[in-house]
Curated annotation (Swiss-Prot):
Keywords: Plasmid, Repressor, Toxin-antitoxin system, Transcription, Transcription regulation. Pfam families: CcdB (PF01845). Belongs to the CcdB toxin family. GO terms for molecular function: DNA topoisomerase type II (double strand cut, ATP-hydrolyzing) inhibitor activity. InterPro entries: CcdB, Plasmid_toxin/cell-grow_inhib. Toxic component of a type II toxin-antitoxin (TA) system, functioning in plasmid maintainence. Responsible for the post-segregational killing (PSK) of plasmid-free cells, also referred to as a plasmid addiction system. Half-life of over 2 hours. Interferes with the activity of DNA gyrase, inducing it to form a covalent GyrA-DNA complex that cannot be resolved, thus promoting breakage of plasmid and chromosomal DNA. Disulfide bonds: none annotated. This is Toxin CcdB. Coiled coil: none annotated. It comes from Escherichia coli. GO terms for biological process: plasmid maintenance. SUPFAM superfamilies: Cell growth inhibitor/plasmid maintenance toxic component (SSF50118). The keyword Cytoplasm does not apply.
Length: 101
């Protein structure tokens, strides 16, 4: 499930999120996720290191790294993309947020 993008089953300002939790860490009934926001909503001046741009289909999204949250698995909807190829960018954004590196 790590680095997969899913729809959010609950009503929220975010429609999609990326699962960032390691698959070897078992937290029964919960997953750590980062919501995605339409890239149009953020200025190009906003850090692409902290808020990476990802492309899903023909749309651009920004990872809202500072909005990382634990969600119940019951809100995880349909898988819509795999961002495994962006693993380093995702990890770097998380490292930047927590450790400034």
């Amino acid at each position: 499930m790590q680095f997969k993008v899913y729809t959010y089953k609950r009503e929220s300002r975010y429609r999609l999120f990326v699962d960032v939790q390691s698959d070897i860490i078992d937290t029964p009934g919960r997953r750590m996720v980062i919501p995605l926001a339409s890239a149009r909503l953020l200025s190009d001046k906003v850090s692409r290191e902290l808020y990476p741009v990802v492309h899903i289909g023909d749309e651009s999204w920004r990872m809202m790294t500072t909005q990382m949250v634990s969600v119940p698995v019951s809100v995880i909807g349909e898988e819509v993309a795999d961002l495994s190829h962006r693993e380093n960018d995702i990890k770097n954004a998380i490292n930047l947020m927590f450790w400034g590196i």
